């Protein structure tokens, strides 16, 4: 139903012959809605890759209405998979912007987390795989993962004993596909050329196109009613004046003579007609069957003509106020289908998660003071502290110098080490 309302209309479609010339096919479909923004799209080309994120149906309708009224509007992505999104750097979908999308993670109890919504572009399998990889690398500690997904997403994450659920949630966002960053790039074909536009610009072009298509539809409908009105007026005069019973008509020697007689009889009424009477009109009058003539009712004919004139006046009013007509059309669309498209993705501002604070201490740091090496593989040497593979190490030497260096399997730092430990960034309490 939506496609019939919005996408398909043979009367406003530009057609061309198919490859074999036997059928017609559309050059483009006359779409009266920003489907590109509603569905999103992704494509690749050398230097012209495109990634347009999907948006909410109701918000697109509201934005189109606001634009037509000359009011401001803002559009932000909305995903069927739900989750939450940080649009601080969305940049109206233009190249160079970025959004962060997170899964929805709930605490069922102190030992179990439930992922019920996943980020856009991910599947339950890819999310689970990313969690298991993070476990293998020692980034997070969990006991097992269960996939109970059916009609709705449900991934259960069972925590290891003694593991903080809050810290694990942050770690899932930091090290797995529970949080992803997406870089939109609104590259579209406009006027047969690629252009990098904003989402707002695309919506404005769509709204203008919708207005033009609705105007075309009104003009086509008006033309059809005018044709019906023209023939109804001809038919009424032809039957009421009993032109079909004229002696000259009945005794016409050929079709041309009959047409000439009808044309002559209609001549006094020409000023009342909408357009010039053609031979095709006269031939159509001659095709009226006797049964229709016998059942003809003048009052009903007058009612029909009056009704068609009212419809034409109404269409003329719509054409004179085409912006208001387009606004009402978008409002009709929203009222008819909007309840089926609630917003699924929550708009939020995400706090930055520092990986070093949520990663599990999955390694042990050692030092060989005599040879000047530190690392996680020097298990026979002096133990320093537990650490993770993304931590930094701070080292002070006896001459007063110090260095900060990443944790490594084995690294030469120098002899005469006075102090060594895991370096905590933004630690304002420790004095060296």
Predicted feature residues:
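C-terminal interaction appendages of subunits in large macromolecular complexes
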Residues: 2-6, 10-11, 15, 29, ...
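Short, surface-exposed recognition loops or helix-turn segments adjacent to catalytic cores
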Residues: 14-22
